[in-house]
Amino acid sequence: MKGKITLFFTALCFGLTGCIAPPKGLEKERFSINSYREISPQDLTCHCKTVRLGGKIVNTTVLANQTKIEVLSLPVSSISGKPFVELQSDGRFIVYFNGFVEPENLKERYITVGGQLAGTEKGKIEQADYTYPVVQADKYRIWTLSTIYEYPTDDWDEDDDWGFFRWRYRPWYVQPEIRYYLN
């Protein structure tokens, strides 16, 4: 009986681990560079490195045969491939997609992209000059930011005196903890 329980929980753990796999084609092992900080000046000139980067989409421009996206780089989870929303940005990069991608579908969204590092491109961020690393995308996944409001559970403790009709008067409201996640 003990062996069956152990086997059940082991299978359950492996089953739940499979639920957080990265999107197909964006597995960490397929790319030689997996973060913005790993990009060196030599990588930008050789055009031979594959990268997996992610972040928040800042700007989208539709060109004649391709779509150009400016991305505010964020660290990407090595397990799920999702950008970490809470962390500081490493910088910015530009992604080129072959064909047309609807710009309205990309507003206020997050992206994980895999492709070939294709050099640099000069640009501006407001008044400052900036050199963007450029990625020619093969695979990508768009993420939507969702919000959860979590209320503290200690407010409903069984040991509290609930008063008349099993509830007590509260002249204040408990503030929820706001959590963000990508789906």
Set out the residue ranges of the language-model regions.
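Sec-dependent bacterial lipoprotein signal peptides
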Residues: 1-19
